[in-house]
Amino acid sequence: MLTYENPIIPGFYPDPSICRVGEDYYLVNSSFEFFPGVPLWHSRDLFHWEQIGHVLTRDSQLPLQNCNTSGGIYAPTIRFRDGRFYMITTNVSNGGNFFVWTDDIRGEWSEPVYIDQGGIDPSLFWDDDGTVYYTGTHSDENGLPGIGMFPVDLETGARLGETKIIWYGTGGKCPEGPHIYKINGWYYLMIAEGGTEYGHMETIARSRSVWGPYESCPHNPIVTHRNAHREVDFHAVGHADLVEAPDGKWWMVCHAIRPSVFMLHHTGRETMLLPVEWDENGWPVVNENKYITAEMQAEGEGDVRVQRSWRDDFTADAPAPRWAYLRNPDRSRYAFGGGLTLHGSADTLDDLGAPTFLAVRQQQFALRYETQMQLSGHADAAAGLTIFHTNEHHYELLARPAESGLAVQLRRRAVDMQTLSEPVVFENTGTLVLRIEAERMKYTFLAGPDASRLRVIGTGSTQLLSTECMNCTFTGCFAGMFAEGDCTAHFAYFSVEDAREA
């Protein structure tokens, strides 16, 4: 048997949607206030995934100015039809629902085509007669939420009919994330319910007509951990999409969370892979109705593990796809090649602007982040490493220029609680090695003139950066580099090591 690891895409990569073209699978995730938008992944076997870019790479496609925390890009759907890829999503901060398209999955995507429809979580379905249907969240005249549908013109984005609610779900709150599939003469409508927290679930219904009425699956929900005991590997399972492999087997991608301590999580909602079978009555059975586990088995041979350790020396003239900016970046403040140079600005990590910030998603609990930084500038400026979740929840290992060297401090913010440690001055140097050691329950921040002479500057609890300690956030923790104020910081490298191997 083949053993693979869940999550297949770890870290803040929620709301997965998938399609297959021949032997190739493509998957996208939501990205909220981070830029570029909608991470784009490729696989040949569903187990090994490579990020090949993003769908939304231009400011004109993705305006995020002054976007609130967990604003921006919500759940996307990716589909392929007649030689063309389509990605439809919602920018809840600027513009609403829209789709883009491309004929080259590794190339540029079109400008947005906006659709005059409220709600979130849009999806597209092509019927046998060529009619294209839009589905998404919608409320009826009494305010009851459900899934709305109407035919749409993909040339213009124009609605070709009125919105009709085709299913209200099974009674769980927040019916959302709809996808329609036509399988063996049935129209299957699969949705998420229960909210994206610990009551999350996936349900399905079917009809002989695309307009319904839809019959609910007798064993709904088809996926959930809402009743699971605390010790299971994952919670908040839902928001799924289905794909058929070339061999006729079916698979589901969905997201879930990994609690770090008790019922708190800080790495965000992560992408999972589950096998699907169809029972004698034509209903899907997901993962044999068992709980999702960190180690899964499938037909084949091998042991598939996600990459935990890597290093970036920033030799290219642009960041690799794994890197993210916060909102639309001022590109004049970033220089790549022979390391990374950041020029600070007036925007800080406390603001809803576009601070000088480049980071990657935290993908495991036990990791070691390290960089070598050279800093020059005004004494009030700061640069260094950050663990960032939102503008109100972040920790920084920062350095400031001092008369005789560099002064290092640990800055911690959790809503209105802010602390700044006493400065530790490293004499006669403008260069430091900075390290963050991540564990399940805490971060340890270290600095020194080189990697063999590091000094602990302080620690910070992961609990205060957990989603459950925040006011409505759908993202997860990032680790990376920043610069604030009048300064220039040069980073020779950024490395991530699997701390389990230490």
PLM-predicted stretches and their roles:
Residues 1-502:
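Carbohydrate-active catalytic/glycan-binding domains of CAZyme proteins
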